[in-house]
């Protein structure tokens, strides 16, 4: 099956292992260095050895993704920083644009692709300027502009906006002769190849109901979430749940849970308003799914009386409901009227737009 190597970010002794966790008792003294990977000139094997996965959220093993050959194709760096509030990818691009370009060149060589694109929103002006300078003398790497909307970082949106190819629900970028990789994933590829470094660190954004919202770069994977809530000045009271991820697709998390390879955001929410009335929930692939929307309704003390799906939701080849055109909302008036007829007094929506 699919999987990736796991490396501890701090030194210590393994105390226990179960299906979800490897618990390490940390040594009192920690080195500033890390145990380097064995030297190799095989870059694809190096990526596999490092345990790199798609750190933007999907978690797919990068060594498997980059084993595909796409001669004449395209490698696209997903620089959308898709979810609101999050800012660590933008910070990286502002500060290390040349490193991102080097990473793209490694992937071009691995996959046989002819061109590399950095797909980014226009609102990230400082990052755009830095990347423009870094790409100036790179004939095979250029910048592609994404619309300032959610979910601009969806792979099918990126393919549509950069290559002009509309993928059907369930189709992968490979069917457009393209490979897409999140910018932080590319950062970790560069570290593995140039520094013999395994994937042991993560960039995160901490925001919401904390005193000092901030971006933390290269934090050790495995430390508890509570450490970074504290580093951000602690909670502002009253506060609600911690959301791991972004506002649209994040999920509830507990303080004691660890930072993992795909953690990007830690957002402290407001307490749920106690509406205690009948609501409808509107589901779309672009946002929160039914389970999450029901959690929100429960937190509000509301009764779910109607469940509707965006009319763009269609089954893919595996029967999973997917959005036909992510980011292009068809309007939800018909669905809202249906929920009203079902007795809903309010709507909790998981769609990409109003």
Describe the role of every protein-language-model region.
Residues 92-98, 123, 305-354:
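Cofactor-cradling patches in redox/metallo enzymes
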Residues 1, 7-16:
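Generic structural motif
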Residues 114-225, 231-238, 246:
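Hydrophobic alpha-helical positions that pack around
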Residues 94-111, 295-297:
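Histidine-anchored nucleotide/phosphate-binding helix
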Residues 75-89, 210, 313-319:
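Gly-rich Lys/Arg/Thr-decorated short loops/hinges at beta-loop-alpha junctions or inter-strand turns
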């Amino acid at each position: 099956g699919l999987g990736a190597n796991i490396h501890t970010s701090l030194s210590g002794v393994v105390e226990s292992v179960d299906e979800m966790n490897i618990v390490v008792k940390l040594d009192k003294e920690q080195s500033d260095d890390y145990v380097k990977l064995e030297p190799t000139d095989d870059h694809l094997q190096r990526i596999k050895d490092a345990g790199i996965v798609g750190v933007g959220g999907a978690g797919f093993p990068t060594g498997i993704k980059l084993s595909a050959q796409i001669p004449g194709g395209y490698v696209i760096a997903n620089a959308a920083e898709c979810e609101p509030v999050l800012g660590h990818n933008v910070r990286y691009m502002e500060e290390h644009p040349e490193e991102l370009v080097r990473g793209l060149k490694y992937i071009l060589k691995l996959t046989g692709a002819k061109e590399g694109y950095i797909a980014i929103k226009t609102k990230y002006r400082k990052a755009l300027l830095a990347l423009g300078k870094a790409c100036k003398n790179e004939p095979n790497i250029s910048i592609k502009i994404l619309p300032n909307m959610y979910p601009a970082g969806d792979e099918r949106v990126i393919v549509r906006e950069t290559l002009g190819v509309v993928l059907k629900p369930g189709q992968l970028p490979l069917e457009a002769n393209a490979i897409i990789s999140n910018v932080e994933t590319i950062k970790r590829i560069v570290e593995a190849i140039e520094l013999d470094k395994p994937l042991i660190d993560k960039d995160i954004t901490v925001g919401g109901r904390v005193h000092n919202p901030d971006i933390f770069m290269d934090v050790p994977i495995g430390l508890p979430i509570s450490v970074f809530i504290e580093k951000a000045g602690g909670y502002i009271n009253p506060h609600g749940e911690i959301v791991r991820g972004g506002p649209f697709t994040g999920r509830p998390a507990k303080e004691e849970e660890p930072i993992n390879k795909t953690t990007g955001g830690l957002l402290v929410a407001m307490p749920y308003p106690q509406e205690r009335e009948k609501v409808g929930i509107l589901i779309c692939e672009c946002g929160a799914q039914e389970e999450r929307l029901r959690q929100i309704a429960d937190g509000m003390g509301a009764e779910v009386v109607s469940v509707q799906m965006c009319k763009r939701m269609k089954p893919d080849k595996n029967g999973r409901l997917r959005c036909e055109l992510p980011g292009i909302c068809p309007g939800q008036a018909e669905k809202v009227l249906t929920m009203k007829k079902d007795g809903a007094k309010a709507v909790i929506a998981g769609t990409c737009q109003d």
